[in-house]
């Protein structure tokens, strides 16, 4: 919604790009990789190898790709419910089974039912947990102790954690 005409140079650049005929993400520039590597190096003094980085067109396609690549058909994926409904789609659409671990709601606050969660993680068919922090839709920001406990349980039961922390 612009109140003025687009600059002729911009119009011409759009025409040139449209003439190319390919509108997907065809080439990922080195700058893209370097931006991520530099961010982690500056903020966390951690060097990420380039081959750890994979370009995705969004969070939802990334989650679906991870579910597909890191699990096999008929394996189980744990989610803490209620949860962002797209997680269900990413699991079901890839032929995986969902295990719901309902959050507890007591005294106006949500918490993880660790007894139930461990039972679900201990299932030999469980290979992945999709974790959301802050939790969507309840808005809970999990504290360090909770995160460590979830991590410890996943390590104990050899379950990979996919952590969605976009918000």
Q: What positions do the PLM features span?
A:
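N-terminal small-domain helix-loop-helix segment of the aminotransferase-like
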Residues: 1-58, 65
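Conserved PLP-anchoring active-site segment centered on the Schiff-base-forming lysine
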Residues: 69-91, 118
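A short helix-loop-beta submotif of the ANL/AMP-binding
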Residues: 93-99
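Short beta->alpha connector loops at strand-helix junctions that form conserved
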Residues: 81, 100-105
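Generic structural signal for small/hydrophobic residues in well-ordered secondary structure
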Residues: 14, 36, 53, 77-78, ...
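Active-site phosphate-binding strand-loop segment of PLP-dependent enzymes
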Residues: 103-167
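Short, solvent-exposed loop/turn segments at secondary-structure junctions
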Residues: 1-4, 32, 60, 84-85, ...
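A short helix->loop->beta-strand "cap" motif at the edges of active sites that frequently abuts
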Residues: 75, 96, 156-160
């Amino acid at each position: 919604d612009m109140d003025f005409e687009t600059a002729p140079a911009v119009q011409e650049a759009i025409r040139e790009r449209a003439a190319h005929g390919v509108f997907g993400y065809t080439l990922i520039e080195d700058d893209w990789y370097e931006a991520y590597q530099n961010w982690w190096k500056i903020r966390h003094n951690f060097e990420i190898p380039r081959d750890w980085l994979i370009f995705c067109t969004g969070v939802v396609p990334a989650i679906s790709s991870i579910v597909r690549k890191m699990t096999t058909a008929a394996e189980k994926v744990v989610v803490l419910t209620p949860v962002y409904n797209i997680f269900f789609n990413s699991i079901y659409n890839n032929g995986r089974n969902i295990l719901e671990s309902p959050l507890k709601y007591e005294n106006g606050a949500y918490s993880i039912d660790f007894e139930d969660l461990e039972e679900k993680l201990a299932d030999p068919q469980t290979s992945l947990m999709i974790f959301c922090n802050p939790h969507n839709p309840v808005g809970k920001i999990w504290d360090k102790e909770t995160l460590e406990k979830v991590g410890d349980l996943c390590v104990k039961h050899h379950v990979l954690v996919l952590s969605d922390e976009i918000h």
